């Protein structure tokens, strides 16, 4: 399976969640702007935060339901596609063994159960959010449910207008920044830990895909008589997996090695997968020289602003910079939605400076820029500026 193909699988789902995030943030920001437009002289026209919440949260719940419906279909399609790729791969070995080829993963109960389980797990947080109590924004170390957060923010806006605060936009700026920087998160009552919906979706789906690959390959490999595995290899590999990538192992040896790893294959953002093989028959994908070149590139040191790091570490820095740029653009869009020209200008300058730094860093580190990972998706309620 092609690594870039695998990496792109969650894109549609992540984009849908990014769109939902921007819709919610900008819906609240538009309400903040409209309240500020009323002014102290007409403060008697203001409703309560709970009254505003009726219309706004109803619209948000409708958008949540729409996005969840689209994502549910996308999860179904995505894992069916992955399963189909696995079946086609396995059929190469079935035919070589003079065995009947699989027509579909549904022809095997075990394979069907793997796919169904992967779909159910992927739905969690990407396609099964049923109401606004399940999502919210981070404030300090807590994730506050959306309704509670909305009422708190709008109450603050109403109070500022009623008291005639001199600079309404400046007074509300910290709230807007907090929302934009947090992004929509799944409310976790137990641990208090949370991740943005879009970020966690990408990681969870990719881990689900790799787990499904592993399960299906192990099952079909057992059927066609595989007695070993070959580990995939890629550039910019983490140090803890560099010694195993691209190599072949017997099933027994691989089980022992994988269990000894602090980060087992395919988990915690690992991009590797194990392909079933017949030892002594299946030729290695990479020669020793090719594998040495790949590993050398991963460990090769670069220097940026006096700091030395491996090329792999540089790739992790690249991801962090992309996230920072995207969040700065989210902040810019939120400020535009509230009508805060100064706040929007500050956020725009910040994103421009981060983008320039990102370009310089990629050039010096020899990394390919990924502009698609730095974009902001403006929600449908606000025209892009």
Q: Where are the model-predicted features located?
A:
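Domain-core detector
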Residues: 1-265, 279-385
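Catalytic core of tubulin tyrosine ligase-like
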Residues: 272
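Residues that flank catalytic or metal-binding motifs in active/ligand-binding sites
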Residues: 268
